[in-house]
Amino acid sequence: MTGNRRLAAALLAVLVCALTTTSPVGAITAPDWSGLDARDYAGPIPSAGDVIAAVPLNPALSVRGAGEAFRILYATVDQHAEPAVSTAAVFTPRTAPPPGGWPVVAWAHGTVGLGDDCTPSALPRSARDDEYLTHWLDQGYVVVGTDYAGLGTPGLMSYLNSTAEAHSVVDSVRAVHHLDLPLSPKWAIIGQSQGGGAAVNSAWWADRLTAGAGLDYRGVVATGTPANIERVFARAGPDLPPRQTPPAAISYTSYILAALREAHPELGIDKVLTPRGRELADAAQSLCKPALDQRVGTTTLNDLFSAPVGSLPGIDAALDSFMGTPTEGYSRPIFLGQGLLDSDVPPLSTQTLYQQLTDNHQDVELHIYPDQDHSGTVIASMPDSTRFLQRVMAG
C-alpha cells in the first residue's frame, strides 16, 4: 500500500503539472476587453453557436501573422447543460482566401486560471503561442480561440470539464461561420497540454454538435495530452507521502477542486478538504496561475486533504463524466504528439491514450519527439502536424 501511495503521489504531481499550455507572458497584465466586456452579460442567449456581438480585437492582443483580428461573444452550453455565453479571439490570414474560402482551426488554450482577469482573448499571447498560431495562419487557416464559458463571461469556467470545454470549442467554430468572412466548411481542432485534452474531447463531440450545420469536421492535433487524470485524482488524500510538490501542481489541483466542487455540489468536496485545501480551492476561483502559485507557497498535496477523495460516494462516476476522455466513437483522424523529455505530461500518459484508442480501432497516429520537452513539442511537431492537416483537409 505504501508503494501504491507513493506512486499515486508521483503521478498526481506529474499529471496535474501537465495542464499548462501557454507560457507565462511575464508581468501580470490588466485585461483589455477590446470594447466587448461580457463579464456581467445578462442579455438574451440565442441558440448555441450564434454570435451575440463581434468587435475588432485590440491590435496589441493580436498575433503577428494575422490579417484581421476580432473578439466575439457567442452562445454555448455550460457545465450544467444550461445556455451560456463564451468569448473568443478570431484571426484571419494575411493571404487572400482560396476558392471555397479559408478552412478554420479551433485553438484550445491551456491553463491560465479561472478568474475573469485570466481571459486569453483579453491578454497578450505568449511568444510560443504567437509563433504557433501564426504558423497556422501562414498555412491559410482562420484561427478561432475560445476562452471557454465562464472565463470573462458569467459563471465559473469549468476547468477540465470535458463536455463543457467541447461545447465552447465546437460552438466557437459554429459562431465564426456567422461572421462575414469567406470560410470553407472544412475545419479542424488544435490544442496543447490541457488544451490537448480539450481538443481530443472536442473531436469526439465535433460531428455530434454540428449535425445539420453544414460544417465538415476533418481531424484533431493534440500535443502533450494528459489522459486518465480522473483515475489518479481519485487516489488523492491525506496519506500521500508529505513530499515537497512544485507550486504549479498544487495550483492545478486547486483549479480541479474548485471546478469539480461547482459542477458537482452534491459530492460535498469540502468534506475531504482541510482548511488549507478549502482556502486554496476558494482562491482558485479568482486567481490567475502566477498569483495562485505564489499563494500556494510550500503547501504539499497531502496538506489539501482531510480524507481520501475516493471516500466520497459517487466520486468515480462524477470524475469520469467530468474529465474522462472517450476512447472510441471518433469520426475523424487523431494526431497525438509527445516529447520524451516531457516532465509535465509523462510520455506514458499519451502512450496509454494512444493504446486505448488503438485497441478500439480509432484512426489515431502517435508522433514521438525524443529531444523535446513539454513546451518544445508544440513547435517541433509543426512539420508533422502540418502534413497531417493537409492530408485530412484534402481527404
Regions found by a protein language model. Name each.
Residues G26-P97:
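Catalytic-loop region of hydrolases
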Residues S34-D37, G43, P59, T223-T325:
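Accessory cap/linker subdomain of secreted extracellular hydrolases
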Residues Q79-T87, F91-Q139, G152:
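Short, surface-exposed "cap/lid" segments of acyl-processing enzymes
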Residues Y159-D180:
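Alpha/beta-hydrolase active-site loop
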Residues R174-P246:
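Primarily recognizes the serine-hydrolase "nucleophile elbow" in alpha/beta-hydrolase
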Residues S202, R332-I334, P346-Q356:
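Short alpha-helix in the alpha/beta-hydrolase fold that links the catalytic acid
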Residues P308-A318, D344, Q351-G395:
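C-terminal catalytic histidine-bearing segment of alpha/beta-hydrolase fold enzymes
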Residues Y330, F335-D342:
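Short beta-strand/loop motif that positions the catalytic acidic residue
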